[in-house]
Amino acid sequence: MEQQKAPQVTYLEVGSLVGHNGFVTSIAVSPENPDTIISSSRDKTVMVWQLTPTDATSPGKAHRSLKGHSHFVQDVVISHDGQFALSGSWDNTLRLWDITKGVSTRLFKGHTQDVMSVAFSSDNRQIISGSRDATIKVWNTLGECKFTLEGPEAHQDWVSCIRFSPNTPTIVSGSWDNKVKIWDIKSFKCNHTLTDHTGYVNTVTISPDGSLCASGGKDTFACLWELSSGKPLYKLEARNTINALAFSPNKYWLSAATDDKIIIWDLLTKQVLAEIVPEVKEQAFDSKKKKESKPKAPACLSLAWSADGSVLYAGYNDGLIRVYKSSSQ
């Protein structure tokens, strides 16, 4: 493996979004509403945040807490018109939310175990979900399940992440069976099964132009694939379990959330552009150990770039969403 060069870009923490009382499991942004982001958490809520980029004291504030799920909320996405949020929960259900009104307008029942991942099609007419019950379900917006992807050619373990292509009738799924699958959503057939991972897959994501897929998980590698053919292209090593991946919306970059840092790669050079480690305040004296306890950096679980690519939002297991900007901006 070629020698890694030193990181070339410095990202600074410009503040945090404070409001969740549990792991921040997912973050969603919308080009339609650049002053809003939405997050999900193990505190059973979906949070709508009002961003305040001109406020030097805080990057944003909690605007509305969407409540209805009875267990951890694992994933949230925003419809492409910016009007609705869709969440998946460990209570085995999905919920559709009217963002403006702050109410749940539809409840999706059908999975028999935790819902791990949800997604909208580019025309907002189809909804997909992946679950610990090892199935992928295809729904309409009325909450009716139209098809279930299961059986021998489907995943044989938890479906941890699922995403729609932005411009073709294709979905990509990742699973704890160590496989990534590429599906034709019209025929409901699996076109490709990708087997390069040697551990469970936590995350899959598709590039903004729909040409690439990236996947990551326990084996510490981000695998890049050609979406149309399923051809493996190359691997990038994170040296720690990958919890989430996100392509930059306007640069040829890929970011990875791991247990100890965020890594940003330049996909043209395959080099690390930046490594982001959160600032950790010194912890108080630990009375049980009778000595100073060494502060442990929180693990990054979720990532999202702002629609213009200038800001990186990162959700952590301490309940904070940290906001990062390049020092050159």
Swiss-Prot record:
Leader sequence segment: none
CDD domains: WD40
GO molecular function: identical protein binding; phosphatidylinositol binding; phosphatidylserine binding; protein kinase C binding; ribosome binding; translation regulator activity
SUPFAM superfamilies linked: WD40 repeat-like
Protein name: Small ribosomal subunit protein RACK1
PROSITE patterns in the cross-refs: WD_REPEATS_1, WD_REPEATS_2, WD_REPEATS_REGION
Keywords carried by this UniProt record: Repeat, Ribonucleoprotein, Ribosomal protein, WD repeat
GO biological process: negative regulation of translational frameshifting; rescue of stalled ribosome; sorocarp development
